[in-house]
Every structure is written in structure tokens, then in C-alpha cells.
Amino acid sequence: PRLDAPGPVFFLVIDCMRYDQWLVMEQHLRDMFTVEKDFYFGILPSATPYARNAIFSGYFPSDIERVFPNLWSTGDDDDYSMNKYEKEFLEKLLERRRVKLRSDLKYIKIIDPEYGKQMVSNISSLVKNHLTAIVVNFVDMLAHSRSDFPILKEIAPDESAYRSLTNTWFTHSSLFSMFKQLARTPNATIVVTTDHGSVRCLRGSKVVGDRETSTNLRYKYGRNVKADARHALHISRPEQYRLPRRGMTTNYIIAKEDFY
């Protein structure tokens, strides 16, 4: 329905954005926009290769494996190999829904601040498009940097401090500059969502698996992968959770609470 409106539509997927982080950002946008909020359930595992592909394709991961069987053939759960077809997924979704755009779909992935600044300077040309889909990786980078760099651990030692860090980043970001420019665009509609959030993990748990077991910290898959049932959800039949099978003997485990 949003695409039936006369103005441009911007679909922003902010990678790894938690709801409390959105509330921090939203307080700066209320005076510029009319804000409507809706909620929907995420999928498990709540990780980019599964969740973001599901958003752009309109399919569960098991359906993506069936319709696009080569996607999960590499066995690598990284953003490049697993999420490089997002534009094609969205085009196919619009085609299935019989949505006719007034112009070609524009897809942009912002992976560094410099590219974000370039996009802000190009807003005047982007507003001429009917639908522009934008993936913003800054919040995901913030979450990973929080774990990797001691200085950020000191700056954001708890959730309250993490929200404060989010606020500082957002108010000085190219993303906020983009919002301010779009607020001056007549009839512009912005749909903001996320593929997943983040959890501050404090408790480790032992995992048993072979050398082919995936290396992800919050979920793993492989042949007969095991973990303490108190610490992880064990999925022996991936199809029940609409997950790709990846072979006859593959099972998944997904960490609970703040375990990793």
C-alpha cells in the first residue's frame, strides 16, 4: 500500500538495530515526521544471513533454499556470500506481488561512513526513484566493535551506556543527515526496520561438533552438533523451524538468553 502513494518510498533496513536503540533514534525524528509503529516476529536464528534474506525475499530460509538452491551451497554465513542477492530477491518479491514500480528499483548498501556521506549528497537524485531500498550497516559495526575494542567496552559497559553511545553516534551520523533531508521531501514515505538485534553475551557454553561445524558464536550448525540443553535450543529437524537443511545429517543449536 505504501507504494501506491505518489511520492518516493525509502525502505531502510538498519542491520542489528535493537528496539531500545530505535527508541533513542526516534526521539530525534518525531518533530520531523509522523511516526507509525508496527511490530512483527523475527525468525531464528536472528542473524543477518537468514533474517535479512527473509525480509528481502518474502520467503522463510527453507523456501529460499528450495527456490534458490545455490545460495546455501557454500556453507559460509557471511554477509558477502549470503546476502549478495538482496536486490534480486526484492525484485522477485515485487514481481510475485504484481507491484509495478514507476522507475527501476534502487538498492544501496552503506558499509562505511564515507559512503554514507556520498549518499546524503545524492539524496536529490534518489528522491526521483519510486522505491529505494537501503541497508545500513553502522549499528552492526557498533555492536561488533563494542566486543572487539577495549575502549568501547569501557565507554559502553552496560545497556544504558550502550544506548547513550547509540544516541551520540546517531546525532552525528550521515543516517541522521539523510533523515533530515528526506523530511523536506514532499510526500516521502520512509519505512524503517531491522533484520535482528543484539544481546550482550556474558556466559559461555561448551559446544561439541566436528571440524565442519560453523563458527558462529550465537548459533551453530553441522553434523550432530551438541550443547547443554539449559544453554541452547537444539533443532534436529531444521524444516520445523523453516531453516535450510544443508544435508541429511545437519542440525542447529541456538544460544539462549546471554549465552554464547
Residue ranges and their predicted role:
Residues 1-260:
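Feature captures the catalytic ectodomains and active-site-proximal regions of enzymes
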